[in-house]
Amino acid sequence: MNNNENTGNQETIQRLKTEESLWALVSGCTKEPYVVCDPETFDDEIMMFFSAQDAQEKAKQLNEAGIPVGIVKLEKRQMLLFYTSLYTMGINALLVSEGDTQTRIQLADFVRRNKPEQDPEGKLLVENPSLHLTALYYMQETRKPSVQEGNPQIKEWQDEISNYFSKGSFIAAVQKEGNGIPVVKLNDKEVYQAIFTDIMEFQKFNKENQLRPIV
């Protein structure tokens, strides 16, 4: 870890709130933020940058190491929703890089979030951050161009995913008009019903606003 890294830097936190643009790494395997577990702090963190050049350099390093990633630009108007979505993914920290300086910021230090069991209208709030996070790690590893056979970590993730799935509550989609259930076709033979870990994942699927969620 870089010697310049520090924790809870207020200047960095302020910039994360006010910069006109930021950049983040996105996994080429999941199309979601690239997440890593810090070996010293065990933070589940994403990588963010104040400049496109720094983001591109880091992406190049990882791609050369066989880890497929890209970069995404975040405009100021997108940032609050982006930060909030990290909670539903089980991500708790941001590793912010600028030149040779790295600053680890805890998500809860600048995006506070109350998560009641029910919303004001009495509807159950469905989220599965542990499942979402484990699935991200699993897919980042198993969809790499070269996967280490017999990796015990992969089996551990599979077991955790099965456990979280059996205990969780999920969102299904039905058509607003009628009760039709949308399905996802992977090929001519495999057809699946789509279910979602949380409302944000449901909204990604419901871009035309023709569906309603049920738990």
Q: Model-found features: residue ranges?
A:
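An interfacial alpha-helical scaffold signature
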Residues: 1-215
